[in-house]
Amino acid sequence: MSGTGASADRGVLVRAAATTDDALVARLRVRFLADVRDLQGDDVSTAVRDATAEYVTRSHASGALRSWLAEDDGEPVGLVSLIATEVPPTPSDARPFDGYVINLWVSPDRRSQGVGRMLLDTVVAHGRTHGFRRVNLLATEAGHPLYASAGFATNPDVVELHLPR
């Protein structure tokens, strides 16, 4: 899949988001945040909404963020975004990028119908085509089976430190 024009028998089309989709991508990112944190949409602050819209616009314009939308008859039913990070070569792998998947979100009424798989396949294909070394993500418990079925594995070597505000 190239990331544009991928479709399923269900009539869902995955397409690359354009700059004219920035507001939609930001709104769907807020829905993703509300879903994974079990919030109502109104519980996401205006500051977070505004910062999200600014981030999406700035990052799409710079090329640091790519997003794809899943649509059914023109209506958005899913979103996935990818942050590309330039990385230095190693003796075993000189490819220049790692990808970090964010916002893999599917509308609740379209879950378990293959939309998430279409979005994931699209973002992985983009990584392969553009010389990414790896693609990683943080998974919800519900998302683990999808990612495992696509070949993703947990990495016990990853260590992180959350810094206080």
Protein language model annotation of sequence segments:
Residues 110, 114-122:
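Conserved acetyl-CoA pyrophosphate-binding loop and the N-cap/start of the following alpha-helix
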Residues 13-27:
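A short beta-loop-alpha structural element at the N-terminal edge
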